[in-house]
């Protein structure tokens, strides 16, 4: 049977761990009480009883005999504690649960009935503290979610009105076209069917907007790291205009407008439609939206100039804004994503309530068992009547969100709605584990055979077959580096899950489509078995003297097959994961035009450790595209100048992409740390460039430049690794030279990890000292050093996400903050 402490830790929301009942500390307090009770019992047993004490003690022990209590419970003293309820402001508490109440427990008779009265007082003081903490957190989160629910209800109302206006405009456009075809002199409207609304300019749209509201909305926009799920524009949803008449989600729009001011986003355009002034804000996350935003900005400038000139001439200028169906659909997806996140947060809060209630029950039961006092029934009545347990707002709000989502985003289909609101986790199959073992054995056997044959043929020595090492070996090394990296990612997933690091939330993975660590291991073992099998067969043909074009093309064909599998459109071989990978790569390549999220710059960091792989890929593409494999002219791609210059570009690209991501994040968030981080990647680009230049010109000048630039870049990178990415080396931390919060219990592991990262960061020294391992070919030595860099990156990944997870936990951030598209404004 699983202990409750394990069950509690496994089910709590990781980012809210500090807000849960500190069950483990309360258990320590009970152990101190237990030790005091045992000590008191030992003293009582060794003390001789007086004549007057003996009958009382005898009666006491007789009453504790099991057969006198048919239910097996010892006699417990009643009324050991009294719990006082009062308002936080100091006023007295009422009979029911009131938000802002605090609880304080008093021991009857000053704790004289306990073996250690001080320990008992400390226990109940901590228990009161935990109950008050749970109530405060629950109240705060509940209010936050209720306010979010009210905002979403108003968003849906605005969306319904805009959709109705779009439909009405389409109908009017159709009638105009029919009239035009029937001989009407007015020209038909050739623009995209849209709703025309008057523009409310910035000087007219804001009235009395407080500075605090603007800062809050700016923070909401900056904290948003989530993107709406990509869907086609054909997914049109029907939303009736009479929304929310029967729902309980929030107050009516008029009442809400009268009781709290409307917030607006700084900038953007406001439109007046259906008697409502609305500012529309679609986040600029893609190149298309970037171009659209620039176009609208220029259009605004022209309209402003036209408006000023019209006012000067005494004429009235009617400004119009076209809100097409595409923009309405984008707003619809944003609202749907916000509803999903709200439902998820409400589910977390529901779990928070049930787990904390169970923790109070368990800990009080332990207390009664240790002290033989009847405190559980008294204190549990207080817990059961406290705010976090009696408030039903979360349950009602979940029902409302469920109802709204089913009605407006699932066409009335409850099952379809639950696929979004409560996605089922994929069950892990034992078949996957079986095939992992099967392919691991196959890979081991083939790899041993390949190594034996390569050793006999002397392929990897300095006097080896130059053609094979220049053309075929890069294919094997490239696959090895890639799948080694993927294997380490599987190890990262295993460790993140074991330590309860919520990587799926950090990376914004879909729970039903994410790769589990067993899936990653299966992909690695299967792929490497195929690769090593094909390369073993190819090496066998080479050793036997076959050197035709078909034989030389085998490594290239293998690479082509894997590339085709990567882009395969059929729903096989983890298509959703393959396409997500390609999407992330696309976002990295087009970095300045896409909003940068965690998974994008995390993947770009991985590419920075795979520069040898990218250079091998560039060389192989040149070798096979130029048909050099037919003549076995492996030196062609290194002799031609533009291919040689391309090697510089490939060495720079990962660092350039990462630097552009830093620039985009600085542009979006305004944090100067992103500019400092950009400098780190610029130094890495300079170091990579000097290394490539030194490889082409082995002069003392280039060697000196390599040492100087690489040393400075390494110091820069180490500082950023330890202080920024890992959050370590905090001098004022309660854990010296580390940080306040640590997930791993053994502190020495962090110091060992910093030392290992330092050693592996010095791999660039191979450029200077040219190490030779026996008679091995230099390409093999470079592969070993490249593998060490991949291992360093896999090791770095764990601590990078640990720090990110702790940042989320420090802010109690367990759900994404999706920005809302519509912002109501008031006009003068």
UniProtKB/Swiss-Prot annotation:
Ranges of residues in domain SPX: 2-381
CDD domains: SPX_PHO1_like
Ranges where the EXS domain occurs: 638-828
Record PROSITE patterns: EXS (PS51380), SPX (PS51382)
Membrane spanning residue stretches: 434-454, 475-495, 523-543, 553-573, 700-720, 749-769
Residue ranges that the UniProt entry lists as topological domain Extracellular: 455-474, 544-552, 721-748
Cellular component GO terms, alphabetical: plasma membrane; trans-Golgi network
Membrane topology label: Multi-pass membrane protein
Free-text tissue specificity from the UniProt record: Expressed in roots, leaf blades and flowers.
Xref: InterPro entries: EXS_C, PHO1, PHO1_SPX, SPX_dom
Induction text: By Pi deficiency in roots and shoots.
Gene Ontology molecular functions: inositol hexakisphosphate binding; phosphate transmembrane transporter activity
Keywords: Cell membrane, Membrane, Phosphate transport, Transmembrane, Transmembrane helix, Transport
Cytoplasmic side: 1-433, 496-522, 574-699, 770-828
GO biological process: cellular response to phosphate starvation; phosphate ion transport
Top-level taxon of origin: Eukaryota
Disordered, as annotated region: 169-268
Regions of compositional bias (Basic and acidic residues) in chain numbering: 216-230
Protein location: Cell membrane
Cited function: May transport inorganic phosphate (Pi).
Protein family: Belongs to the SYG1 (TC 2.A.94) family.
UniProt name for this protein: Phosphate transporter PHO1-3
Gene name of the record: PHO1-3
